[in-house]
């Protein structure tokens, strides 16, 4: 069965994704229709960041995946050399 | 048509619609707030897909369960196979 930690981590991931989705939807979809003098604009970064942040996050993710794959492959190569 | 082709067609259709609307190729005069929503739309779709993926993984982590019946069935099948193989002269 899923233990307590699993449930906490899983529900935390669900909550995180819901928070990100709600905030991003409000930022990108709803904000242009709200008057630009409204107080709510204080709680959001300028609009260019709505693209820049996901782009940077995606690049970081790809970078880390690449580093991980390189590390694992190099390690495997060394291991097979040792056994031969 | 394969699933891949379907997805590619849908993406191409959506992408060309988006490009046409953003570049103003159709000659439509959209209100400025609509245009503000339109240009980050691909990023928005990507982020939504990412959120959905993260949520699915989280939900499955929170609710996964052991398949006890299947484990019992598998154990009994292993026993059966061992007995059968021992009868035919295989030693473990």
Curated annotation (Swiss-Prot), chain A:
Output the GO biological process annotations, alphabetical, semicolon-separated.
Answer: dolichol phosphate mannose biosynthetic process; GPI anchor biosynthetic process; protein glycosylation
Cysteine pairs forming cystine bridges in this chain are none
| Entry keyword Protease | no
Q: Where in the cell is it found?
A: Endoplasmic reticulum membrane
Keywords (alphabetical) are:
Endoplasmic reticulum, Membrane, Transmembrane, Transmembrane helix
Q: Name one GO cellular component term.
A: glycosylphosphatidylinositol-N-acetylglucosaminyltransferase (GPI-GnT) complex
Q: Answer yes or no on keyword Signal.
A: no
Q: Which domain of life is it from?
A: Eukaryota
Q: Name one GO molecular function term.
A: enzyme regulator activity
Topological relation to the membrane, as annotated = Multi-pass membrane protein
Per its record, how is this protein called by name? Answer: Dolichol phosphate-mannose biosynthesis regulatory protein
What organism is this sequence from? Bos taurus
UniProtKB/Swiss-Prot annotation, chain B:
Q: In which pathway does it act?
A: Protein modification; protein glycosylation
GO CC: one term?
A: dolichol-phosphate-mannose synthase complex
Q: Which cysteine pairs make disulfide bonds?
A: none
Annotated transmembrane regions: 8-28, 37-57
State the UniProt keywords alphabetically: Endoplasmic reticulum, Membrane, Transmembrane, Transmembrane helix
Annotated GO biological processes are: dolichol metabolic process; GPI anchor biosynthetic process; protein glycosylation; regulation of protein stability
The cellular location(s) given in this protein's UniProt record come to:
Endoplasmic reticulum membrane
Question: From what superkingdom does this record's organism come?
Answer: Eukaryota
Family as reported in the entry's similarity comment:
Belongs to the DPM3 family.
| Function description | Stabilizer subunit of the dolichol-phosphate mannose (DPM) synthase complex; tethers catalytic subunit DPM1 to the endoplasmic reticulum.
Give the record's subunit note. Component of the dolichol-phosphate mannose (DPM) synthase complex composed of DPM1, DPM2 and DPM3; within the complex, associates with DPM1 via its C-terminal domain and with DPM2 via its N-terminal portion. This interaction stabilizes DPM1 protein.
Which protein, by its recorded name, is this? Answer: Dolichol-phosphate mannosyltransferase subunit 3
Organism encoding this protein: Bos taurus
Q: Which gene encodes it?
A: DPM3
């Amino acid at each position: 069965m899923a233990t307590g930690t699993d449930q906490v981590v899983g529900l935390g991931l669900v909550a995180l994704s819901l928070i990100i989705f709600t905030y991003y939807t409000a930022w990108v979809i709803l904000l242009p229709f709200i008057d630009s003098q409204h107080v709510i604009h204080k709680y959001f970064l300028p609009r260019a960041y709505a693209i820049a942040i996901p782009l940077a996050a995606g690049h970081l993710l790809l970078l880390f995946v690449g580093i991980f794959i390189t590390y694992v492959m190099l390690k495997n190569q060394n291991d097979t050399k040792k056994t031969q | 048509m394969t699933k891949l082709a379907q997805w590619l067609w849908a993406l191409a259709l959506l992408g060309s619609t988006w490009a046409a609307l953003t570049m103003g190729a159709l000659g439509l005069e959209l209100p400025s707030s609509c245009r503000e929503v339109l240009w980050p739309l691909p990023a928005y779709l990507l982020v939504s897909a990412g959120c959905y993926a993260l949520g699915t993984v989280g939900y499955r982590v929170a609710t996964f369960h052991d398949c006890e019946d299947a484990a019992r069935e598998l154990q009994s099948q292993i026993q059966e196979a061992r007995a059968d193989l021992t009868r035919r002269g295989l030693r473990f």
